[in-house]
Amino acid sequence: MECNPVSSTTSSSLLWDWDATASAEPPPPPGKRGGRDSSSASASAKRGRSAAAAGDAAAVAAEAPRCQVEGCGLELGGYKEYYRKHRVCEPHTKCLRVVVAGQDRRFCQQCSRFHAPSEFDQEKRSCRRRLSDHNARRRKPQTDVFAFGSGTLPRSLFDDRQQISFAWDNNAPLNHANTTSSSSWTSDLQLSQVMDISKRSRKAGADSANIRLSNALPTLCHDTNELLPIKGADASETASKLDGALDVQRALSLLSASSRGLTDPGHQTSSIIQFTNSNQNSTLPSVPSEGNSNVPFWVDGQHQAVEPQVFQFTMDTGNTVFPDLERIKPSYESSMFGLNQIH
């Protein structure tokens, strides 16, 4: 009996094909599976982001303000906020003449606007209206200046001082001023104000207040539009408009005139009003009419002296008494300096 081997069809399938296995590519590691696909996706994402950034930059560049001057159109993205806000480049803010919207204009650095060239003064960089307002703010108000027509004198005049001096020129003729009864000037230098001066001086610690009226100083013009300088501790300042010049001259009429007539025009005199308290035991010493009591002054470059006249008034705590005012009424009482015009 013969045994023939049976051919098996599965033998070939049981054998490992090493050649085919060697020629095949090794499988990618687990962490690298799909790497080509992920790299391409990230690259596309980067390209998308760069395109978006470029679009944003283009939009910003399109929205950047430009100079509104015709023929310029400079982009102001790199300029300061001031120039971007007003849409003008720095060189054109200093030009004397530019064209904006078809009209000649000039940039005002105070208003930050364009104005017509006629609104500027020469080489000024600001318009005339703004310069006027700016200069008005820079001017400081005058200090220690008061009008003689005001009700009271400033309190600063009575701080640590016992003397207030008013100076004017008495050489001018009396008829230089208007002597008619219809004069529009009003007298505010009342006797109550004289009392107020004395009370203020006593509050400041002074036992008496002297108001020295020095005639013959060529400093006053009789025009009401002139200024009256104050001669005293603060001589650097001048008085304001002489609205009440007549008031002082009316008071002068009580001093410069004698009890029976006018003083010689060629003889210069000065007068002193002395206020003394009736409650005090001591009184102010009288000023002699000769010796060193003469008040010096200058007339036409020559040093001269005047003889003072002293009128002493008693100041009571409750009442103020002026017993001799009526007896010294001047003979020219019908004029503007008459006693009857003092209220």
From Swiss-Prot:
PROSITE patterns, alphabetically? ZF_SBP
Q: What is this protein called?
A: Squamosa promoter-binding-like protein 11
Q: Please list where the region (Disordered) is annotated.
A: 1-48
An annotated GO cellular component of this protein is: nucleus
User: Motif range for Bipartite nuclear localization signal?
Assistant: 124-140
Q: In which tissues is it expressed?
A: Expressed in stems, leaf sheaths, and young panicles.
Q: Which cysteines are joined by disulfide bonds?
A: none
